[in-house]
């Protein structure tokens, strides 16, 4: 079943790459008369898209999304406006979406962290005839809201992929460190990880921590390891969870002995992977979450192209010791 899903994802990406090549293709060479009448600005497509996300472009994660949006706007030769509330504020985000719909753009890209708060605004966009692509969050509700496609990572599948890799590395008993038990997305990450490990004959327990207190998180991880010497592996659900795990293992002298992996990237995580202290990071490739929706909207407006898969998966991608140095350079360039 998992192989078929991976095949479907690979096929979707192959089709998407082909469509991008077509969309990026230069227009036919103009005649001399046309060159004189058509300045460079005329090469711009007449489309204006609006992106509304719950994350600010100044945030390290979302700045990479914004870079993807900007690159796609250049490549597709379209106008794109990127908007976000100043903080994580669903009331403000709803207002931004409503204002975007009122401005009648040619397409809308939204993240959907809270479908209860944003659903009516997204439905209003669809009802107004505005094509909508969702990205990053909302894969489970995008279709029912009328969204054409969702571009992002399905959390269960990402966790499952992490579990497969951890089990392949020889892990038999793991801890999934969850900083927000009850957060559906994070719970799904642990569940996918648990199911993949179980399929390989390994077991997982969930450890709740509070990342507002990194020292306490480190102590909880240390206590869990001391309380069960059979634990041989740890998965954290983000870089802020990886940091106290690294600190705990280093303090116990078990770095490298107990396998460690995490979701998402940070300079500390990338350095640890490069140096062989961590096995891998599960990368949702947020640059693609910014880039691909602009391509999809352009192709939809220009040629009514759609992709059959409701969710275009940008992850899980994996950063390992083999590619960490390259990813470090790409992260410095703002594309990873």
Positions of PLM-derived features:
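Extracytoplasmic "Venus flytrap"
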Residues: 41, 46-76, 81-97, 103, ...
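Short, low-complexity disordered leader/linker segments with a strong preference
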Residues: 1-48, 74, 101, 123-130, ...
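Flexible loop/hinge segments that line or gate small-molecule binding clefts
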Residues: 115-157, 171, 264-274, 278-279, ...
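Hydrophobic alpha-helical segments within soluble ligand-binding/sensing domains
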Residues: 43, 150-174, 216-218, 265-269, ...
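Exported/periplasmic ABC-transporter solute-binding proteins
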Residues: 232-239, 246-288, 294-315, 319-326
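Hinge/cleft segment of the Venus flytrap/periplasmic-binding protein
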Residues: 32, 36-45, 181, 196-200, ...
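Short, solvent-exposed amphipathic alpha-helices that sit
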Residues: 60-75, 158-162, 184-203, 220, ...
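Hydrophobic alpha-helical
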Residues: 110-127, 193, 205, 211-271
